[in-house]
């Protein structure tokens, strides 16, 4: 676990990160070893913070765990908020897809340095420095080489096949780690809580598809769902019909007279009610000289006087 400072805050707000050991080593070796950059989120198109290991040339996404009323004790200070940040490895090709899809609408081959351009997120050019980038681009683009320079054009067909492999790899990882996905798929599909689902192959594929969809645009997610032949989630099972209330302008009248059960009647009881054998025996007991139970709990008279 490591701590950092948010330089954008005048109060030098400290952040708590959970990092792999090799990332901590990289930060010690070089001040520029770890770079926090703002890049486009491939799913929403909004800006998001990512971590780049300049030494190992790896990309990490930042996940935040948040709970209310939590704080951190950091050395001799207290940091409010209690946020816990996680850095998890991420395939940079997901971020490049955003620019490849956008350029692909022009329908022509272009050099990569003309595709990955963003005035809003200028650090996107750092994605071009990752090793084996050209090898990865073959999964999602058509490629041409002219005068020793390579040109690329986005391919939907190749991308869907690549994403299908990602889904299959995710399914295998879920099974290997014995992750129960049945209940989670039920919850996300708004199934009835009464319906119990077992971990079927379809549940694994649907859950893996949902995980991958967090890194791609919705339109591409829908195309991937069709490729995987995922059926539409069934509608939620209806609850048993309740008695319908008649809605009208007039006030609803009670069908019974509930005033007959008031406290006075409950205290006195019905005069004509039959007594049990125990009640009859108690009635024959001589109660003369007995104090009421209220006498033991009544307030005592206090003596008052002037001083």
From Swiss-Prot:
Family membership: Belongs to the RNase H2 subunit B family.
Name assigned to this protein: Ribonuclease H2 subunit B
Record's keyword terms, sorted: Acetylation, Nucleus, Phosphoprotein
Entry-annotated residues carrying N6-acetyllysine: 291
InterPro entries: RNase_H2_suB, RNase_H2_suB_wHTH, Rnh202_N
Known partners and oligomeric status: The RNase H2 complex is a heterotrimer composed of the catalytic subunit RNASEH2A and the non-catalytic subunits RNASEH2B and RNASEH2C.
Classification of source organism: Eukaryota, Metazoa, Chordata, Craniata, Vertebrata
GO biological process annotation, one example: negative regulation of gene expression
GO cellular component: nucleoplasm; ribonuclease H2 complex
Residues modified to N-acetylalanine: 2
Principal place of residence: nucleus
Modified residues (Phosphoserine): 292
Gene for this chain: Rnaseh2b
Subcellular location: Nucleus
Claim: Phosphoprotein is one of the keywords in the record: yes
Annotated source species: Rattus norvegicus (Rat)
Keyword Acetylation: yes
Protein function: Non catalytic subunit of RNase H2, an endonuclease that specifically degrades the RNA of RNA:DNA hybrids. Participates in DNA replication, possibly by mediating the removal of lagging-strand Okazaki fragment RNA primers during DNA replication. Mediates the excision of single ribonucleotides from DNA:RNA duplexes.
């Amino acid at each position: 676990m490591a701590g950092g400072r948010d330089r954008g805050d005048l109060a030098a707000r400290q952040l708590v990160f959970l990092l792999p050991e090799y990332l901590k080593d990289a930060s010690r070796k070089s001040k520029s070893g770890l770079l926090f950059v703002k890049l486009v989120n491939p799913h929403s198109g909004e800006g998001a913070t990512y971590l780049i290991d300049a030494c190992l040339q790896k990309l990490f996404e930042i996940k935040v765990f948040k709970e209310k009323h939590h704080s951190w004790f950091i050395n001799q200070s207290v940091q409010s908020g209690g946020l816990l940040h996680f850095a998890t490895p991420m395939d940079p090709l997901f971020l490049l897809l955003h620019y490849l899809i956008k350029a692909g609408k022009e329908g022509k081959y272009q050099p990569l340095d003309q595709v990955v351009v963003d005035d809003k997120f200028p650090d996107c050019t750092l994605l071009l420095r990752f090793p084996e980038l050209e090898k990865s681009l073959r999964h999602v683009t058509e490629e041409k080489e002219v005068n020793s320079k390579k040109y690329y054009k986005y391919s939907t067909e190749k991308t869907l096949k690549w994403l299908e492999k990602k889904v299959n790899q995710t399914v295998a990882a879920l099974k290997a780690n014995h992750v129960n996905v049945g209940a989670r798929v039920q919850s996300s599909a708004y199934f009835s809580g009464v319906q119990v689902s077992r971990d079927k192959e379809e549940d694994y594929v649907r859950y893996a598809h949902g995980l991958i969809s967090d890194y791609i645009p919705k339109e591409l997610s829908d195309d991937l769902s069709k490729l995987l032949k995922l059926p539409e989630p069934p509608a939620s099972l209806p609850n048993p019909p309740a008695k319908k209330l008649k809605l009208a302008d007039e006030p609803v009248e009670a069908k019974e007279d509930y005033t007959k059960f008031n406290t006075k009647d409950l205290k006195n009881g019905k005069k004509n009610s039959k007594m049990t054998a125990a009640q009859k025996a108690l009635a024959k007991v001589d109660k003369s000289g007995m104090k009421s139970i209220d006498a033991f709990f009544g307030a005592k008279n206090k003596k008052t006087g002037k001083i």
